[in-house]
Amino acid sequence: MGTPNIENLRELVEFMAKSLVDNPDNVEVDEIPGQQTTLLALKVDKEDLGKVIGKQGKTAAAMRTIIRAAGTKLNKRYHLDIVE
């Protein structure tokens, strides 16, 4: 596996989310570059929101940790935001 780039991180978030939800066709990831931090906005079906967040937010926290770790390799900051 090569060095991750923003397209791979977007695809990674999309893959993780689609693996968790009942409605994978409604998963969408938007990338919003900023000056210091790139935001990855994850949109899922309202009924799948709990599955992506997980008990006590553990699933969402794990996804954010993976994204931050990949960003560290690129010397960039990434933030995962889960929106309805």
Regions found by a protein language model. Name each.
Residues M1-K51, I66-E84:
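RNA-contacting regions in translation and RNA-metabolism proteins
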Residues I53-G57:
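Glycine-centered tight-turn and secondary-structure capping sites
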